[in-house]
Amino acid sequence: IISNIENYLTHNFTQEGEFIIHPLLVQKTYSETCWIPISDEELIQNKEWQTMIKKAEIKGLSEVMVHNTVCLYKTDDSNWCGKLYEETTFKKLLQDIKDNRYSLPTQREWEYLAGKGCRTIFPWGNNIDFSMNLKHMEWMDNDGEYTLEKENFFGLIIGDDPYCREIVYNEDEFSYKGGDGGRNICGGLGVVWGYFPVSPYFKDKELSIGDYINGGYDFFRRIIRIDDSVKEGYM
């Protein structure tokens, strides 16, 4: 087992190095992709959506979704909101970045934002703290706030859910950090293996990036470099 873990860490984790991380303004939480908000007026006027909401209310549901089409959900104040799925590509995301003059973290910048340069698998150590309240772990007491959804040392919500992978960009290539789309958990590998992908240093080397963004699993975090002429560098 130890040998398997060592091989896994060697193959799926970035290697230790020394880097200079320049000052950044960082979005506190990641943003979802592909989903476009529905206006209140449009939601009220659409008879099909109103029927879906009424059926959900009868069943006591707070959310109803048609895969890659529409999602209707109830907010904390019991109002219903909605969003439409709009297929998008990494090329479109890159254009949006250029048009709106923000950036995405590089791989090493994201690792620092999530781990603060820690030399352990997770920011808190090399193993799962079983007192944590973790998402997708049915055997845990999931009442209340999830532990990893709290602000970290930089005030960021980051690396909190293995199903949610963040898009990073460096050297003209997109890649993922912070999750594997839930593959390890869905594969029945348990809490430790299932949560390896939230490690600051996890990198799925076998995963290839296609043309299209997966709105169910792909997220992004805007950053602004104080001096946009520099990124992280080697020491």
List each model region and its residues.
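Residue-level detector of solvent-exposed, low-hydrophobicity positions
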Residues: 42, 56, 117, 129-131, ...
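Functional-site microenvironments in short loops/helix caps that host divalent-cation chemistry
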Residues: 71-188
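General N-terminal targeting signals
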Residues: 41-43, 48, 121, 139, ...
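Extended beta-strand/loop cores of jelly-roll/beta-sandwich
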Residues: 1-104, 210-235
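Surface-exposed recognition segments
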Residues: 150, 154, 159-235
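A short linear-motif detector with a strong N-terminal bias
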Residues: 3-7, 101, 144-145, 198-204
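Glycine-rich loops and low-complexity Gly/Arg-rich segments
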Residues: 49-54, 128-131, 190-194, 201
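Low-complexity, flexible helical/coil segments
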Residues: 59-66, 140-142, 200-209
